[in-house]
Amino acid sequence: TFLTSHSAHIANTMEFAKVRYAQKSNAGVIYKNLNTFARANPENVDFIRKYLTLTKCDLFFADKAIFVEGASERLLLPDMIEKCETAGVFGSCKYPLSAQYYALIEIGGAYAHKFIPFIDFLGVPCLILTDLDSVADRVGESGKVVKKSVVVSQGETTSNETIKWWVRRNNGLPECDTSKIDLTEITSMTTANKTRGKCHIAFQTAERGLCGHSLEEAIRNVNRTHYDLGDSISEEDLEFKGKSKTDFALDLICECSGYCVPDYIKSGLKWLNDQRVLE
């Protein structure tokens, strides 16, 4: 029996070995056997299948994909895309990102890298928006040295597994490599370093002399008036406290409609917008 479907529920509950992925191209239609991917990536296939099933993800039917850290990004991204389009960030194009079919997938930096081989296999342009997550060695309560979250200017490395995976791949190192990655190597990455095939990674960058290590801190940095922050502040003043991340995002949308979008998000969205798919 051969069944074609546009149902994310059906596609995600099927065994990978039984799924054939059809994709339009300028040369016609390309068919991909997901069993080929499953055999080549046994370490990740169970995680991907379970995630797609549990979240009812529409990745199979999207022209592009955006992986985000959490609730704040998931709520804010559609509005940020509209803002970028209105501000002319995407330039002049027939179908800007807001008019394209993109899958918005909420998955943290600890797991996003597990999807990258699958994205490469499908050939779908993908933007990974993740957090810098700067950390440094500090003596913990037990007297042992542990990794503690610190402001970017004091950071030694990152706790973000996806960023570490990315840097290791750029340096030709195996995934199992445990050597320390200096934060300066991460923060100095060029646009070319942040792009691998049809995948692009974006994280917080310095703006107005400071750099946050999360979305919330980056937003507070470029919207200082709204958060009663002056020009003479430190990275410690950017720290997000109190409200839940969902409340933070909703408050921003409802109470500060003219907010500024952080540069790393604008540049990442522009990269994704510029990736051409069959029209």
Task: Outline where the language-model segments fall.
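Acidic, Mg2+-coordinating catalytic modules of nucleic-acid enzymes
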Residues: 52-67, 71-279
